[in-house]
Amino acid sequence: MIGLIGRKVGMTRVFTEDGVSIPVTVVEVEANRVSQVKTLETDGYAAIQVTAGSKKANRVNKAEAGHFAKAGVEAGRGLWEFRLENGEEFAVGAELTVELFNETKKVDVTGTSKGKGFQGAVKRWNFRTQDMTHGNSLSHRAPGSIGQCQTPGRVFKGKKMAGHMGAERVTTQNLEIVRVDAERNLLLIKGAVPGSTGGNVIVKPAVKA
């Protein structure tokens, strides 16, 4: 399923003809350039590799420079891949724009969530706090028991505990496209999308629409 790579600009609002305010996230979609086409014969699966934006020449290593030169496209800030469905064909060097979503109503948006650093179980996992009084003087935000005793004699993997919060890949599904601005290469998506301002986001047609 083909999507687009964009950059989160920030949030604003637009008004309907009835005067209703709709909160939207603005995603800037610079031209997505196809840097490689993968086929069943050569790679075992069908996909396109795309790059977006630009990168300083002194930040492009020789391997990347050769790869982009072979495709005849400008070096971008990263490489992403989209699987192709039967019948879909793209040429190396082709450009994908926001017009790809002219007929699309709902999208899934993937980004890297804001990093929150080391956080306790209350903030990280929404644990309830313990009593503020009634004899409790030290363990107000402590997580409590983390397991059993000699059986099994260990803490199970995946146990919700304090640790690094955020800075992970997150997908928000079924967001509505409010407007496609082809002139300024902008997508206006209803509601919030993952990540901080300036972060990369992947916008794809919704799988559950």
Swiss-Prot record:
Family, as annotated: Belongs to the universal ribosomal protein uL3 family.
Top-rank lineage group of the source organism: Bacteria
Name of the protein described by the UniProt record: Large ribosomal subunit protein uL3
Post-translational modification: Methylated by PrmB.
Alphabetical GO biological process terms: translation
Listed PROSITE patterns: RIBOSOMAL_L3 (PS00474)
Keyword terms, alphabetized: Methylation, Ribonucleoprotein, Ribosomal protein, RNA-binding, rRNA-binding
A Pfam match: Ribosomal_L3
Function: One of the primary rRNA binding proteins, it binds directly near the 3'-end of the 23S rRNA, where it nucleates assembly of the 50S subunit.
Description of how the protein assembles with itself and partners: Part of the 50S ribosomal subunit. Forms a cluster with proteins L14 and L19.
Cellular component GO terms held in the UniProt record: cytosolic large ribosomal subunit
Keyword RNA-binding attached: yes
Gene Ontology MF annotations: rRNA binding; structural constituent of ribosome
PANTHER family (UniProt xref): 50S RIBOSOMAL PROTEIN L3, LARGE RIBOSOMAL SUBUNIT PROTEIN UL3C
InterPro entries membership: Ribosomal_uL3, Ribosomal_uL3_bac/org-type, Ribosomal_uL3_CS, Transl_B-barrel_sf
UniProt key word Ribonucleoprotein: yes
Residues modified to N5-methylglutamine: 150
